[in-house]
Amino acid sequence: MPRPQRCRRICGLPEHTKFIPEEADCRDAIALSLDEYESIRLMDREGLTHEQCAEVMQVSRTTVTEIYAGARRKLAEAIVDGRMLVIGGGQVRLCQRLPEDRCGLCKN
């Protein structure tokens, strides 16, 4: 039996949760979880390393690497195959923006 998934910290919810190509079949959507979205945001948009991203999300570096690889595969599939991408769900908790919990990279 697998271990229960640990809650990952994210710095905010995405403003846009659906991306739909003009001729996409909406029944065949790809689901990108919030932690996958956050790994893409932190590493590709903010320029963090895997180690820095792991620290912000409060998970191990190997976990971040797995999350990031899965997210990149899903993004590639959505772009190449012209499929709808839906962002949401997953075991996450929002950064509280309190001094003891602040990550320094909050979106808002």
Language model features by range: what are they?
Residues 2-3, 8-34:
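Short, Lys/Arg-enriched anionic-surface-contact patches
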